[in-house]
Amino acid sequence: MFSCCFPTSRGCCFRNGGSESLFRRCRRRLIPHPRRLSPVVIRRIQVPQDSLGQALAGQATPEIPLGLQLHTVLVQEIQELIEAQTLAPGPCAEVRALPAPAAEPEPAWEEAPPERALELEGAPAKDQTNEELPEITEVPESIKRRLGRRVPAATPAPRGNLLLQAWMRVHSWASRLFAPNVLPGTGP
């Protein structure tokens, strides 16, 4: 059985002021060096070549171990590919400018558009006389719902007592907030 299969605690050497050298010794045994993992070592030997990239006569060529395939790509091919990509027009270059319209389009209305704030359901037109106006007696449901949610406004307070009334309202609200829950009709 290998020593790397034994369960070990890596933090044990640091307890109670332990030395770091013990950790280094354990690490050497437990973690092998990456070069030791591969049994095949490939040494690259530079061979002089002529202009076509062929080895010159009488020069040694590097040996490739059996079963190992090396894929080489010429740097020139990669540079050509990068240049072709940078010079190629992007997808935005295909968009053409729209032609100018032959004639100006006519507006949909002859007069100025009506203001949106004055447009209401069932609202009379501006040019109708009072005799022709329909009588609005029914309140739409949407307005009823909005009016039902609103709290009725309190009567306006005199300006002199405004600060006093505000303080009294806050005081009564705070006293209700911190008062014990008492059922109505029962006293303390």
From Swiss-Prot:
Distribution of this protein across tissues and organs: Expressed in fetal heart, kidney, liver, lung and spleen.
Matching PANTHER family: CMT1A DUPLICATED REGION TRANSCRIPT 15 PROTEIN (PTHR16471:SF3), CMT1A DUPLICATED REGION TRANSCRIPT 15 PROTEIN-LIKE PROTEIN (PTHR16471)
Name of this chain's protein: CMT1A duplicated region transcript 15 protein
Organism name: Homo sapiens (Human)
Organism phylogeny: Eukaryota, Metazoa, Chordata, Craniata, Vertebrata
